[in-house]
Structures are given as C-alpha cells and as structure tokens.
Design a protein with these regions (language model features):
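Conserved glycine-rich cofactor-binding loop
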Residues: 25-27
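Conserved NAD(P)H cofactor-binding loop of Rossmann-fold oxidoreductase domains
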Residues: 104-109
C-alpha cells in the first residue's frame, strides 16, 4: 500500500494569510487550496481552466472559506508582460503575500532524449521552471514582507 503523507496545520496558522497557489484548478493545487481555505487563508488561485476555478471558488465559499480571488492564467502561453500585469494586480490588492505555492506543471514527454524535440523540452521548461522563476521574482517585494529566516549553525566537516 502506498503511503500518503498528511498535512498538519495548527489552528489559525493560516488565518487571514495571503496565499497564491498556481495550478489550483485540479490535483495537488486544488487540494492545497481546499486545506488553506478551511484554515481561513485569503487565497489567490491561478489555473488555465477558469471553469475549474469557478467550481473551486463555489466549493470554498459553500464550506465557509474566504471568497478566493481567481485568475485565469496559462503558464504555457503567458508572456513576461502577462506576468507583470499579474504582479501589478497583486500589488494593487494586497499589502503582502504570505505564501506562494507553485503547483502548476507539466510532466513532459516520457520518451528517450533522442525522440524528444526541442519544442517539447521548451514546453516543460516554460511551465515547470520559467513560470516559477518569473512569478517568484515579480512577487518578491510582497513576499519579503512576510519572510522569516531561521538558521542553525552546522559543521561542514566532521
């Protein structure tokens, strides 16, 4: 039997925290959104499928969660200008961003490298890497307002 990890969140730890979740329309992104909503987070949900976002928004509101902001956003088709427009909207509507959960991604093509085209590789890199880079980079001023750094001295050599 496959082990399924569980997530334990202390009561009120996400209450009124602003959390942006990509890939929120289905799968892991949707599950993370529902858990965060049950814990009263203020959600910004991104997906390329607006119908799935509307459905999730209804579920969250019906279950007593805060009404999430939903944004149709296709990481495969988005340009830098689209990312900038999204970031500008975040700056206009939020004082800070407490969390950024990158879930949107594509598996890619399961074939030997000899059978993989450059365009197939570019698709995977654009959705799985470039989108995370651009969204994080443009959101950093909002995220830095909520960062906490903890370090523990460690020894590099025994």
């Amino acid at each position: 039997m496959k082990h399924v990890p569980s997530i334990s969140i202390s009561k009120d730890s996400l209450s009124n925290k602003n959390i942006l979740i990509t890939g929120a329309g289905s799968g892991i992104g949707r599950a993370v959104a529902k858990i965060a909503a049950k814990n009263k987070a203020n959600l910004i949900l991104l997906s390329k499928d607006i119908k799935k976002l509307y459905s999730l928004q209804d579920e969250i509101c019906d279950e007593g969660g805060n009404d999430p902001l939903i944004v149709e956003f296709d990481f495969l088709k988005a340009s830098e200008k689209d990312y900038k427009k999204l970031a500008d909207s975040l700056y206009e509507n939020y004082e800070k961003l407490d969390g950024l959960v990158h879930v949107a991604g594509v598996l890619g093509y399961l074939s030997p490298i000899i059978n993989t085209s450059l365009n197939q590789l570019k698709t995977v890199m654009q959705v799985n890497f470039e989108s995370n880079f651009l969204l994080t980079q443009l959101s950093l001023p909002l995220l830095l307002l909520s960062l906490i750094h903890i370090s523990e001295p460690t020894r590099l050599n025994p």
